[in-house]
């Protein structure tokens, strides 16, 4: 997918540039490891998370909706969704033609809906940024190198 909105923005430009169009960016949802996949077989995929150029814009609210929809269909009684974030939702294409807090408002309303209306537990890890302003259960790490240890520690604490 492309930067700066991709085909979604191109379509908007070709069709009259409607005022306050909402999200103006293509989405890419990546599954590094499905819940049914063996961890050893997916190890190489997890390394792709750090591949330069793979990740584009941060449309966090829609990513959460997608992930919560997938996890809600799982048969397990306890559902935990761990969010790894580099700060706030940012998509220049969308923010350039909507209110500056458009994506942030959507993220907050999505989190509220998941926390209040579902049986999904949300945990957030902010890398270099405090995401506690969005998530009720959040921690901050300063370097991506800390991620593995923190994730293990946080997951372990859920079962204490």
Q: Where are the regions that the model predicts?
A:
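Acidic, glycine-rich A-domain
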Residues: 1-160
